[in-house]
Every structure is written in structure tokens, then in C-alpha cells.
Amino acid sequence: MPRVKGGTVTRARRKKTIKLAKGYFGSKHTLYKVAKQQVMKSGQYAFRDRRQRKRDFRKLWITRINAAARQHEMSYSRLMNGLKKAGIDINRKMLSEIAISDEKAFAQLVTKAKDALK
């Protein structure tokens, strides 16, 4: 019985890895062994950063809300506490968008939060 080397399967697998490594710097997009390692590492980075992205956006929203709240002589934490006590249930993403795009609406929210804290 002749020995089967599986050339087409191996070539296809290697070609797939090299295709995934397209655009990488140096030998990482041409040499199979190095490309394979980099594709694995890239996958780890992608997995980690999909979770990190959620934390980064939340930080950004909080920073924006804090900056807008301080223009109305109020800190972020007092604003959020006031909104909660006023029964205004709005998430940070939407609050951040309101702070950027609609100053008047945000000012009204701040006054309602201030009233609820009194």
C-alpha cells in the first residue's frame, strides 16, 4: 500500500493561514511557521479586545457625561444619583449622546437631577 502524504490538504491549510496573515509586517505574512504563530496571537488579541472595547466605550461615555455635567456645576456621580432618585432611567450611552448633541435637553435632565437631590 503506498504512503499517502496529503499534499493538497496540507497546502490548502497552509494557504488559508497565509491568507489570514495578509497585511502582517515582515516575514509574518510569508513564512508559514511565523504566520501561524502570528495568526494565533492575533486571534487572542481579537478575543481580548472584543471585551476591552465594551469597557473602553463605557469609560468614554462616563468621561463625556462628567464633562457636560461639570459645565452645569455638577459632578458625574451626583448627576447619576439625582437621575436615579428622580426616576429617570437612561443609560450612559444615550446620556452621552444627549450631552453632545442636545445641550438644552441635557440641561433639563441636570435640573431634574438637582431637584431630586434637594
Curated annotation (Swiss-Prot):
GO molecular function: rRNA binding; structural constituent of ribosome
Presence of the UniProt keyword Ribosomal protein in the record: yes
GO biological process entries: ribosomal large subunit assembly; translation
GO annotations of cellular component type: cytosolic large ribosomal subunit
Xref: Pfam families: Ribosomal_L20
Keywords annotated in UniProt: Ribonucleoprotein, Ribosomal protein, RNA-binding, rRNA-binding
SUPFAM superfamilies per record: Ribosomal protein L20
Keyword Protein biosynthesis appears in the UniProt entry: no
Classification via InterPro entries: Ribosomal_bL20, RIBOSOMAL_L20_CS, Ribosomal_protein_bL20_C
Gene3D superfamilies in the cross-refs: 6.10.160.10, Ribosomal protein L20
UniProt cross-references to PANTHER family, sorted A to Z: 39S RIBOSOMAL PROTEIN L20
Homology family: Belongs to the bacterial ribosomal protein bL20 family.
Stated role: Binds directly to 23S ribosomal RNA and is necessary for the in vitro assembly process of the 50S ribosomal subunit. It is not involved in the protein synthesizing functions of that subunit.
Protein name as catalogued: Large ribosomal subunit protein bL20
Organism of this sequence: Staphylococcus aureus (strain NCTC 8325 / PS 47)
Taxonomic placement: Bacteria, Bacillati, Bacillota, Bacilli, Bacillales
